[in-house]
From Swiss-Prot:
Belongs to the UPF0215 family. Gene3D superfamilies: archaeoglobus fulgidus dsm 4304 superfamily (3.30.2170.10). It holds the Pfam family DUF99. It comes from Deinococcus radiodurans (strain ATCC 13939 / DSM 20539 / JCM 16871 / CCUG 27074 / LMG 4051 / NBRC 15346 / NCIMB 9279 / VKM B-1422 / R1). The lineage of its organism: Bacteria, Thermotogati, Deinococcota, Deinococci, Deinococcales. InterPro entries: Endo_dU (IPR002802). It comes from the Bacteria. This is UPF0215 protein DR_A0167.
């Protein structure tokens, strides 16, 4: 009797990555966010929107931007679970609204004790935001990075990183969104760490 062959993970070849623009520490208004749409190694589109500094609208705005580009998208990348300070993304809701898996990527494991303290002591609505971070689960090591995920297996996350990490450890859609955000906001992205 033949040995069953495990299901091959589908190759996730079309993705969008989001990053927020730099902002001054004292800034309290909206912060621009940028998304870079990739098909394999090729940049196909750039989108932008706005989220409130330390606000509650990141999930809604990301859902809107992803849905507008969703025809061929297969994956959403985020560099961290929050945009514009502590505007925390509800990963489960973003996955449910867009129908796409969501992969949060970080170079280092976050210091959750410090994040929890800051949220609960200094940020309006911090308890709700902390619950969203807890619901997302622990960050897991994956391909030399740390990830949180909604809607995909760890092996699929590793395969996606293999597909999109072209010029370093950070996936190209995130790297590009980061460079665009810095370039548009500061006039140049030279010298930025990605």
């Amino acid at each position: 009797m033949p040995v069953p062959v495990p299901r091959a993970y589908p190759r996730l070849s079309h993705a969008i990555g989001f990053d927020d623009a730099p902002f001054a520490r004292e800034w309290r208004g909206d912060v621009r966010i940028f998304g870079a749409v990739y098909a394999g190694p090729t940049l196909h589109a750039v989108v932008s929107g706005r989220v409130r500094r330390d606000g509650r609208n990141a999930t809604d705005e990301l859902s809107r931007l992803v849905t507008a580009q969703a025809e061929h998208l297969q994956l959403v990348f985020l560099q961290g679970i929050a945009l514009a300070g502590f505007n925390v993304v509800d990963l489960g809701a973003l996955h449910a609204r867009t129908g796409l898996p969501v992969l949060v990527v970080a170079r280092r494991k976050p210091r959750l004790d410090r994040i929890r303290r800051a949220l609960l002591e200094e940020v309006p609505g911090g308890a709700r935001k902390w619950r969203l971070i807890e619901q997302a689960g622990e960050m897991e090591p994956c391909a030399g990075l740390y990830v949180q995920r909604a809607g995909l297996l760890l092996a699929e996350a590793e395969a996606a990183l293999g597909t999109f990490c072209l010029t370093g450890r950070i996936p190209e859609p995130l790297r590009t969104a980061h460079l665009i955000a810095g370039g548009v906001t500061r006039g140049s992205s030279a010298g930025q760490r990605v």
